[in-house]
Amino acid sequence: MKKAVSIMLFLALFLLLAGCKEVPVSESSEPLNSNNVIKWFDCLNGDEMAWDGVKEYDLDEFSGVTFRWHPERLEAVADGTTVPLYDGMPIWSVYFYDLTGDGNPELCSTISFGSGIIDDRIIIYDYAGGASYELSDRGNFDYVLNMQEDSLIVEKRAYMQDELIESGELVFLNDTIQIKTE
């Protein structure tokens, strides 16, 4: 009898623990029009942060590639190979938008970075070109992305302050992330 109860408890515990693994949330998009921004998620603007979660996204423009997000890193998975793209503490948002004009979307994110002294910055990852670009000014300014209508907007604030200093459309000119103000 004790043996049967022990086996039942073991099986119940096993089934309970087997259900605790991370299960990625998979999403995909329709083909990207170069004028459209695709929001994957934005935890600073309404989406819930899944601190112990994993999200995945497939884009038609990168057939066979799955972009995988963990709170602290973004990866590309293709043919069973995982390639790290960038890190954050955490990565708050990911948008897809063709900033370089090459017809392929870049990954555009707000990330926090630092240990003790933490700043918010914007990273643009050109997956097709294998290059990354950053808008940051550690200790002086914080930069955050959000989407308004069909545009990605950069908000520049004094470091650790709520006061908005500058706001404008995210643009990429001369291999540099810039804020286009009106």
Regions found by a protein language model. Give the residues of each.
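Calcium-binding motifs, dominated by EF-hand helix-loop-helix domains
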Residues: Y95-L99
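Repeat-based blade/solenoid architectures
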Residues: P84-S93, G139-N146
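Surface-exposed loop/turn elements that mediate protein-protein interactions on large endomembrane-trafficking
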Residues: H70-D87, I122-D137, E166-E182
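Positively charged n-region of N-terminal signal peptides that target proteins for export
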Residues: M1-V5
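Short glycine/acidic-enriched loop and turn motifs that connect beta-strands
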Residues: S112-G116, Y159-Q161
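Acidic, small-residue rich beta-repeat scaffolds with periodic aromatic anchors
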Residues: L16-F62, S132-E182
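Acidic/hydrophobic-patterned starts of short beta strands in beta-sheet-rich repeat architectures
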Residues: T100-S112, L152-I153
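Bacterial N-terminal signal peptides
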Residues: M8-L16
